[in-house]
């Protein structure tokens, strides 16, 4: 950038670059991220973006979940749609706790323990994969929410201790925010939702053609294992 170009590695010739604008984004140098030198930063106009507050996050993801409910082919029971605000609040709360808990802070050995809004949005992206046939009660919807949170946050954790810490966070939140006992809600652990086993879809419908896109809980692990071997 100082000299207006760079050398070609193959021909060793200097290539002049003209009419180029550099746009970059970065986070503060913590959690394994390197410091960017002032010598390099002097080429840029720095713009700092304040993090979204919880009220803004609630509005953003609340609208996404509301859009999802409205655009389903068939209306869901009120007992499920009434969970919207609590689901959004709980997801933001869990995201904040995972980010700030000293037990899950990034270290040199766990430098990937970094979460951002992209991870938060993926929870809702997973929820919106479900269809009317994915759940028939609010308990099914809560299990879907817990599954998506586990896939986004827990799957990144590399030690049993860290995974147990997250499990306790999720169970406590389920009891406090939704008044559900985890052991009574989840009969088969770990939670597993997918859309690749048509014989396990709701209503015992074995028509892969009709319901090949149903994203639902898979409780028969032997059938899951058998289907995975078939795909191999």
Set out the residue ranges of the language-model regions.
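Conserved Walker
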Residues: 2-18, 30-36, 74-78, 109-110
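Alpha-helical lid/collar subdomain of P-loop NTPases
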Residues: 18-23, 27, 42-45, 52-232
């Amino acid at each position: 950038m100082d000299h207006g170009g760079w050398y070609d590695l193959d021909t060793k010739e200097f290539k002049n670059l003209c009419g180029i604008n550099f746009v970059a984004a970065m986070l503060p140098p913590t959690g394994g991220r390197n410091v960017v030198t002032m010598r390099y930063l002097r080429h840029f106009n720095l713009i700092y973006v304040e993090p979204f507050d919880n009220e803004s996050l609630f509005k953003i993801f609340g609208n996404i979940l509301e859009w999802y409910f409205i655009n389903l082919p068939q209306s869901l029971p009120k007992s499920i749609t009434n969970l919207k605000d609590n689901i959004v609040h709980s997801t933001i709360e869990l995201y904040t706790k995972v980010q700030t808990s000293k037990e899950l802070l990034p270290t040199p050995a766990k430098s990937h323990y970094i979460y951002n809004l992209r991870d938060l949005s993926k929870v809702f992206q997973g929820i919106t994969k479900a269809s009317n046939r994915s759940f028939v009660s609010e308990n099914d919807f809560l299990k879907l929410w817990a599954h998506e949170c586990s896939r986004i946050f827990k799957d990144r954790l590399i030690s049993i201790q860290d995974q147990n810490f997250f499990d306790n966070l999720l169970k406590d939140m389920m009891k406090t925010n939704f008044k559900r006992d985890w052991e009574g809600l989840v009969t088969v652990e770990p939670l597993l939702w997918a859309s690749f086993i048509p014989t396990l879809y709701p209503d015992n419908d074995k028509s892969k053609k009709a319901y090949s896109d149903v994203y639902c809980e898979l409780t028969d692990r032997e059938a899951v294992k058998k289907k995975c071997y078939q795909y191999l």
